[in-house]
Amino acid sequence: MFHVEEESSGGDGSEIDEEFGGDDSTTSLSRWVFDEKDDYEVNEDYDDDGYDEHNHPEMDSDEEDDNVEQRLIRTSPAVDSFDVDALEIPGTQKNEIEDTGIGKKLILALQTLGVVFGDIGTSPLYTFTVMFRRSPINDKEDIIGALSLVIYTLILIPLVKYVHFVLWANDDGEGGTFALYSLICRHANVSLIPNQLPSDARISGFGLKVPSPELERSLIIKERLEASMALKKLLLILVLAGTAMVIADAVVTPAMSVMSAIGGLKVGVGVIEQDQVVVISVSFLVILFSVQKYGTSKLGLVLGPALLLWFFCLAGIGIYNLVKYDSSVFKAFNPAYIYFFFKRNSVNAWYALGGCVLCATGSEAMFADLSYFSVHSIQLTFILLVLPCLLLGYLGQAAYLSENFSAAGDAFFSSVPSSLFWPVFLISNVAALIASRAMTTATFTCIKQSIALGCFPRLKIIHTSKKFIGQIYIPVLNWSLLVVCLIVVCSTSNIFAIGNAYGIAELGIMMTTTILVTLIMLLIWQTNIIVVSMFAIVSLIVELVFFSSVCSSVADGSWIILVFATIMFLIMFVWNYGSKLKYETEVQKKLPMDLLRELGSNLGTIRAPGIGLLYNELAKGVPAIFGHFLTTLPAIHSMVIFVCIKYVPVPSVPQTERFLFRRVCPRSYHLFRCVARYGYKDVRKESHQAFEQILIESLEKFIRKEAQERALESDGDHNDTDSEDDTTLSRVLIAPNGSVYSLGVPLLAEHMNSSNKRPMERRKASIDFGAGPSSALDVEQSLEKELSFIHKAKESGVVYLLGHGDIRATKDSWFLKKLVINYLYAFLRKNSRRGITNLSVPHTHLMQVGMTYMV
């Protein structure tokens, strides 16, 4: 049996939205008053699939122009009637991580070392080795020049770019490529899947600084991004390419770190051959990926102290070598030695850049692993501990090499004092294992974000910590990375080819991050154009120069990682393309409301007692699969709720803002639409019983709020009937979000488009004063009757109606489209995880129907 997938979806129709932040007192003091206005134009996003319970005579356009309308407005902020959970505690949200004391902060700092800085912390193991393999040492000045390159690479990339700029471009504490993309999507409608709702902008997570109307530059960028499909596609391709490089980085990081650490055996033992190093490295890698499932919180406290000891070793060995050999290497802080290095070595110096960039590997991990820790903790740890220890380590190696040119083949282990070799060797191997985990955990986070935003097939995600929801483990991805990592290690067998692949992956991520952060600085931060230009120009020039160097050695074996990254990119692109086509087709095929009205409240079939939860991917309209249920099944439930699991581009949606409800058709139909909104960081761990309970309670609150609004309308009609002696005068209700409703229609009823009017036209409705409820008592009786109906339906049982929608390319489609849709996308859908499995619904509660769309 198959299960419906919790596709991130939605529509572009209008919803009655909520402004959070008011307290209960302001809500209770809200009142409705009439405000006369000669003309009012309905928002063009008004829902087109709603139903007006009363028949209103259509007016000619000339008559409309002559009418004087009154609008009913609320004098203080109100909450969204659809977002019923928010009625409990409007605008409140409980923080996931509470303020901690000194002891817990120290523990968090240790975990920061173990998770974030392992990658960049082990770079001294191989940086000089790879650099001097490409550019052999001719004299001491070459060592000083290479050291100067390393120093200023550490200053420009990890310190200036990432610590002072990129870390602040986080999405409410989330880092990584897709966090940047999500942040941009919130401030400009650039997503290719048109699943946005106006109500999404009312989520608390959207309450970030937006482009100011006074700054024309930000608005121009926003408008151009939203208007250009080419720019949207280019932005998505950039994000997917960057994500593919992140996954590739998770392959080469373990290979490089472990092989360079195990390679120290050749210095300590001497009789160890490279083939034996490869075998031992493979064993270590298998162990590494096997313990990944224990998570960050369980291993962080163990790995943190180990990495702290490693940084102290780097600093101590560096100081020892500076004192014993040559302290004059401090003159490498003079950037002029970079110029002298290139002047003496020309092309070889350019080749050496491919090794130099390895000193900055792990910079992206600082940002990608941000979801685990705070910006300040990462900044302070890097500036006060990591960077000084790294600089001392590189200075010490340079001091040793200045008197031992021949040791450049394994600069780090050769510089370790013989009495400390084996303890340092042991610590370095532990540090290498930690470094390998840093990018793997970052990859897990990035993939989870991409899954939620519809850019990667769904995979099983295991949360390894009950306290920190960002700490996850993805089994399929973990073992896939292990397989590819072993292929890379066994096929290349040396750190030089792996180091080149490492540089390609890291620089690909860095350039993607530079472009996205530059866009954020222009669009969201509204940074001074001079600062933006300096950041973008300096970062891109440095990274492009490094990239040109590593690309010159692709044929040495690093092409393997490019092939792997290309495969990952194609998987994400195909999934996003297929999901987009599927969603657009379902929007086009949705059932017209006229058809449901013609069928009547029984929907042309038998209404059996019970509640049917029809999972679909549309947040607006009735999905075509519902018509398939009506024609396939002998009966349909007495109450049907169209449930859409929708992921929005925010890290987390508060529980108080989770559900949106809307009535479909008149009350006698007992049809509702529910949108359950989740952020890409949210965890869906509730059982199907808990989900049902929350959903039904929220529905009851929605119905009560709807009844209150109808009672208020009824009071308003009776109060003003005497003053209106001509029914040609039209009143419309202006809800707090600007939506327009007839006073004769319940506030939450959906307004039906006239078939002979375009969506952009002005829509007005007259009122039949005798059609509405006669008194508040009638409203109360109607409310109790409907609530009783819900309780009886709930007692009869809840069944999950799952429609398996699939797409196939038409026969006249071009060949490439058939290949992508009929084979690649179909294969990915077949092997991806179904969203309904998170609810653990028993098969006895499932009813499924398949449907294929031709695209």
From Swiss-Prot:
**Glycan-bearing residues:** N404
Q: Where is the composition biased (Acidic residues)?
A: 36-51
Q: What are the subcellular locations of this protein?
A: Cell membrane
Query: Organism's domain of life?
Result: Eukaryota
| Transmembrane annotation, as ranges | 106-126, 143-163, 234-254, 269-289, 299-319, 347-367, 380-400, 416-436, 468-488, 504-524, 529-549, 554-574
Q: Which residues lie on this side of the membrane: Extracellular?
A: 127-142, 255-268, 320-346, 401-415, 489-503, 550-553
One GO CC term on file:
plant-type vacuole
Region annotated Disordered, chain positions: 1-67
Q: Its membrane topology, per UniProt?
A: Multi-pass membrane protein
Where it mainly occurs, coarsely classed, is membrane
User: Which sequence positions carry the modification called Phosphoserine?
Assistant: S766
Record InterPro entries: K+_transporter (IPR003855), K_trans_C (IPR053952), K_trans_N (IPR053951)
As one GO molecular function, the record gives:
potassium ion transmembrane transporter activity
Record key words, sorted: Cell membrane, Glycoprotein, Ion transport, Membrane, Phosphoprotein, Potassium, Potassium transport, Transmembrane, Transmembrane helix, Transport
* Ranges facing Cytoplasmic side: 1-105, 164-233, 290-298, 368-379, 437-467, 525-528, 575-855
Which protein family is it in?
Belongs to the HAK/KUP transporter (TC 2.A.72.3) family.
Task performed by this protein: Probable potassium transporter.
Q: From the Swiss-Prot or TrEMBL record, give the protein name.
A: Potassium transporter 13
Q: Which gene encodes it?
A: POT13
